[in-house]
């Protein structure tokens, strides 16, 4: 099926070997090709600017996919969004939310991930979970605080800075330019159709996590030391006690990891392709 899909898509793509593709066909046509080869179409990083559906194409997926919209079981939220922002759009109430990481480098794998209930590890079971069939489901979404994402707030391309102010920000408060990269937070404020977040009862919890590489003062050697002792970043971020971490890397780092777990870190929002950052409390 993958070879067949690649062969058919090569008719619409200039270089089929590139990692990020531009296909010369509509999304309305694409979903039929995907399903022809037993695939499922799921919009990825659905709100980011430049190339995503909600970020740069439409305010409603149903306008693009029309009667085929019900065949899309899920969307992937992206680093700069979360469940609470996405659930301000009513057409997403019946869609599963996924928090998938990119895989450009080993440290970035699973900086966002999903906890999934399945009977065994297979694509068939995964699809059942995404479609909420036979008791399979997404149990929890683990993702960055969206402020840490590269496109959370609107960015002025002239001044080279995030633009402060209440969302939606649509022009620079310094130079008055509209040469901006719209932030996900600001874009959702424009396209939402709910006055507040209202999630369906079966929506799984969204758990914020601050990857170790974002924590101030935590360098590669200390991260490697933590991983040597505790095996996975998930253990360190979500499961280990303060005392366990303190014994390996000291009170200061242990305190910050606990603060990240409890959502008590101060974060400077990202924008314009630059990650947000954690502000160390003095």
Roles of regions detected by a PLM:
Residues 1-29, 78-92, 97, 113, ...:
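A metal-dependent hydrolase metal-coordination microenvironment
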Residues 1-73:
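Extended substrate/RNA-proximal surfaces in nucleic-acid metabolism proteins
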Residues 41, 75, 102, 175-176, ...:
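Divalent metal-coordination and catalytic microenvironments
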Residues 51-59, 107-120:
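Histidine/acidic-residue-rich catalytic or RNA/ligand-binding cores of hydrolases
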Residues 95-111:
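Short acidic/histidine-rich active-site segments
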Residues 134-206:
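Cys/His-rich short segments
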Residues 255-282:
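Short, amphipathic C-terminal "tail helix"
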């Amino acid at each position: 099926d993958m070879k067949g899909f690649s062969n058919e898509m090569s008719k619409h793509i200039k270089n089929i070997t590139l990692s990020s593709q531009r296909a010369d066909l509509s999304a309305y046509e694409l979903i039929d090709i995907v399903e022809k080869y037993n695939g499922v179409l799921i919009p990825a990083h659905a709100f980011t600017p430049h190339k995503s559906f909600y970020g740069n194409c439409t305010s409603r997926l149903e306008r693009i996919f029309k009667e085929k919209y019900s065949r899309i079981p899920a969307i992937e939220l992206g680093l700069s969004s979360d469940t609470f922002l996405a659930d301000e759009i009513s057409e997403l109430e019946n869609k599963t939310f996924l928090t998938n990481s990119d895989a450009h480098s080993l440290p970035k794998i699973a900086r966002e991930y999903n906890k999934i209930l399945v009977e065994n590890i297979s694509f068939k079971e995964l699809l059942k979970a995404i479609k909420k069939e036979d008791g399979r489901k997404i149990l929890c979404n683990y993702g960055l605080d969206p402020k840490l994402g590269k496109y959370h707030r609107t960015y002025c391309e002239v001044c080279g800075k995030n633009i402060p102010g209440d969302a939606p920000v649509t022009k620079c408060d310094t130079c008055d330019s509209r040469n901006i990269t719209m932030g996900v937070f600001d874009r959702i404020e424009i396209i939402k159709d709910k006055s507040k977040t209202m999630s369906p009862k079966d929506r799984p919890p969204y758990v914020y996590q601050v990857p170790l590489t974002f924590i101030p003062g935590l360098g590669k050697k200390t991260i490697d030391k933590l991983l040597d002792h505790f095996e996975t970043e998930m253990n360190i971020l979500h499961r280990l006690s303060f005392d366990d971490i303190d014994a390996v890397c000291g009170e200061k780092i242990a305190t910050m990891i606990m603060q990240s777990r409890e959502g008590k870190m101060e974060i400077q929002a990202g924008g314009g392709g630059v990650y947000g950052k954690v502000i160390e409390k003095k």
